[in-house]
Amino acid sequence: MFIRRLHKFSYNPQYKLKCGLEIHTQLKTKYKLFSLSPTSYNEPANTKLSYFDVGLPGTQPKLNPEALLLALRASVAFNSEIQPYSSFDRKHYFYPDQPLGYQITQHYYPLAKNGYLELNKYDNIKDKRIRLEQIQLEQDTGKTVNYDDRINVDYNRANTPLIEVVTKPDFENIEQVQAFVRKYQLIVSHLDICTGELETGAMRVDANISVNGNPRVEIKNLGSSGEIVDALQFEYMRQVRLLQNGQGINQETRGWTGEGTESLRSKENAVDYRYVPDSELPAIRLDQQITKQLQKSLPELPDTILERLINKPYNLDLAHAKNLLYQPEVLKYYETIFASISSNANKWFFQELLAAFAKRGVEFDVDIVPPSMLVDIVKKVETEEISLAAARIILKYIVENKSTNTLVELVEILDLKKPEANDELQLAVKEICQQIIKNNPEVVTKIANGHKNALQVLIGQAMKATKGKVHAKDFKEQFIELLK
């Protein structure tokens, strides 16, 4: 979640913030972008490499079609215009984590242009369209690890496929940035394009920020949600102070230290990357129908799911709908039970099932109480084969013991079978109610004085005495009769 550490932060209405983002997103492919090395995130250093990944002479790149497909899916999800022609270029620079001496990217002819992402009420933001300049496919670099006396380089990450998404400078406050990044994470993870995790490096964010139209400052490699907020707040306040003191803003690249931003290089010292087309990779030529075909293949996007869940027939509040959206397995579970017990699905799922897990401090697991089990329990209660109290006892037992018994077996194990309706049962119910009335004169007085809710106290004691075998309505009818 996003956090705000600069508690004294506030916007100065005389100094307008403008911000744009560059988001680098690792694609969830089996193999790397231009080689058959497996993508690797937690393997020992330098164990998932090919000759091409480390730039050995004579090796050549070959485009991974899975990476191209994921990049195209992202382009469609973000309403971008897929280009019929795109190509790869070499971005030259020298750094230990880039063994080729250049990065393969799409500088001149990117994969997609002119997209947008809508922020709205579901993001707790007034309607705002954030335009996307382009989406390009490119390589990730290796990873450097600094020690006191040396730098170690791990090339497992080198040549991992990325998309770089570049927005227009449309953000007018940091809240919009938060909402955009959160929504972006949700969409790429929902479509299984990327894990969407900032903290693991699967997503990395660069921010360009300016105040009152002055030169922009780029903040590089913001690696967590907290860093994005803190760095933008700090940099906005730094630029405002400079302007208030009559000083200018230098166009430069800065880095986040954890406490502030520091200058890395100025515009005058900016790197000349000497972009040239990559002669070893053919251009990508796509059919004009590719966008329509991809649109048909995409699942429901998050906003569409939320819109569906908060309206008929589900009628969920937005908080419940969002909780389901962020947990795809749980959403599937909910929709499965809703198809069978629609009228009672919300009550049983949120008030009974999730409560049974929460009361025991256990995280909800769709495998512990399968949808078919919950549906069976609900139907047994509806046909009065077991009571509501018995159903709660069964859920409690399953959660605590991870029971795989059938419902019939659980009713037997827990001795919850409802007694046969006969005169003997009616007499037993009457005797229990009479004893409870006798033992609770204060509650009876409250009921006599018009406190109708006090009747639930008596019913609760009766249910406890019978271990949930008898329905609450049977006790309620008997208590009302005896208390007339």
UniProtKB/Swiss-Prot annotation:
Transmembrane segments: none annotated. InterPro entries: Asn/Gln-tRNA_amidoTrfase_suB/E, Asn/Gln-tRNA_Trfase_suB/E_cat, Asn/Gln_amidotransferase, Asn/Gln_tRNA_amidoTrase-B-like, GatB, GatB_Yqey_C_2, Gln-tRNA_amidoTrfase_suB_CS, Gln_synth/guanido_kin_cat_dom. One of its GO terms (biological process) is glutaminyl-tRNAGln biosynthesis via transamidation. It is found in: Mitochondrion. SMART domains: GatB_Yqey. Its EC number is 6.3.5.-. Allows the formation of correctly charged Gln-tRNA(Gln) through the transamidation of misacylated Glu-tRNA(Gln) in the mitochondria. The reaction takes place in the presence of glutamine and ATP through an activated gamma-phospho-Glu-tRNA(Gln). This protein may be expected to contain an N-terminal transit peptide but none has been predicted. Subunit of the heterotrimeric GatFAB amidotransferase (AdT) complex, composed of A, B and F subunits. This is Glutamyl-tRNA(Gln) amidotransferase subunit B, mitochondrial. The lineage of its organism: Eukaryota, Fungi, Dikarya, Ascomycota, Saccharomycotina.
